[in-house]
Amino acid sequence: MRPFKLMGHERSLTQVKYNQEGDLLFSVAKDSSASVWFASNGERLGTFEGHMGTIWSIDVDSNTHYAVTGSADLTIKLWLVETGECVYTYEMPTPVRRVVFSPDNSKLLSVTDQVMGQVGTISVFDVNNEEPKNQSSKPSLVIPTRDGAKKVTIAGWSAGGKYIIAGHEDGLVSKYDGATGEFIDSVQAHGIHNEEKIHLVTDIQFAPEDKSYFITSSKDKCSCLIDVETLEIMKVYKADAPMNTAAITPLKDFVILGGGQEARNVTTTAESQGKFEARFYHKIFIDEIGRVKGHFGPLNTIAVHPDGTGYASGGEDGFIRLHSFDKSYYDFEYDAERTERAIAAGTT
């Protein structure tokens, strides 16, 4: 599994994201430009220039027509992927931590920070796909932080945009109606599996096949697999370092976790000391089955290729590593899985 090492950012990576076809990889970092790469060979296709601060998040619509970025400069920018032109800028009251297109590309979700006396909010904007330069600056839906709840740190859409799933600073995961913003339910997903004091939810990524469940990561060194409809915690994956990101793989029943000790807490730069590896767990049996080294700092973001043929990781070290899975990855099976497959083959 020899990766491409992509060097295009001057500072730590904050998010990497594949387009739906998987031929392009988008990346943002604590510098002020976004990059677009060919996923097949790691060649840089171009950049989106215009932000004045850290870009925390990026997303691309299902047609690879528009990309959107959210920044610490208090703006969200809408870009034409083909030309790199910024066609619209949304002015926000506080830094933007997350931006996500709805599954049908008709809406844009953002998570803004709870700073400068402002209440952290989830805002939803209607996207004018026909006239990209004529967007509404006012959100069609605003979900403020609930009374008694900690601020939202991450959010995303369930299948069909039916629900908005949000992660909070205290390890809570909440579910809201995607159309009305009405609060439906919540579950304490983190801060209950060990004695860790910091429970902040750092990532939410949905199952690639149907978005009927999702995975979280947290500073409490755990990751949870949660059902969208019931918010049942189905699986818990325990690591030995704070986790910044987690993803679910298609094709194989695996999940990938990434994180590591923060640089100021590590006495040497050795990756084993800081636990700077991507960790692979079996999705069903929850065992850790392998690690991939390479970064010289915590992994901040992981995205799995839509075809399940590889993954990309972005680190605190400023590098993106683009991995393609080899034969041993596809061949790995537990005895129980092999037996089940053999029985199924014998009955068809």
Curated annotation (Swiss-Prot):
Keywords: Cytoplasm, Initiation factor, Protein biosynthesis, Repeat, WD repeat. SUPFAM superfamilies: WD40 repeat-like. Its main location: cytoplasm. GO terms for cellular component: eukaryotic 43S preinitiation complex; eukaryotic 48S preinitiation complex; eukaryotic translation initiation factor 3 complex, eIF3e; eukaryotic translation initiation factor 3 complex, eIF3m; nuclear periphery. It is found in: Cytoplasm. It comes from the Eukaryota. WD repeats lie at residues 8-49, 51-91, 93-135, 147-186, 196-238, 294-333. Pfam families: EIF3I. One of its GO terms (biological process) is formation of cytoplasmic translation initiation complex. PROSITE patterns: WD_REPEATS_2 (PS50082), WD_REPEATS_REGION (PS50294). GO terms for molecular function: RNA binding; translation initiation factor activity. Component of the eukaryotic translation initiation factor 3 (eIF-3) complex. Component of the eukaryotic translation initiation factor 3 (eIF-3) complex, which is involved in protein synthesis of a specialized repertoire of mRNAs and, together with other initiation factors, stimulates binding of mRNA and methionyl-tRNAi to the 40S ribosome. The eIF-3 complex specifically targets and initiates translation of a subset of mRNAs involved in cell proliferation. PANTHER family: EUKARYOTIC TRANSLATION INITIATION FACTOR 3 SUBUNIT I. Belongs to the eIF-3 subunit I family. This is Eukaryotic translation initiation factor 3 subunit I. The lineage of its organism: Eukaryota, Fungi, Dikarya, Ascomycota, Saccharomycotina.
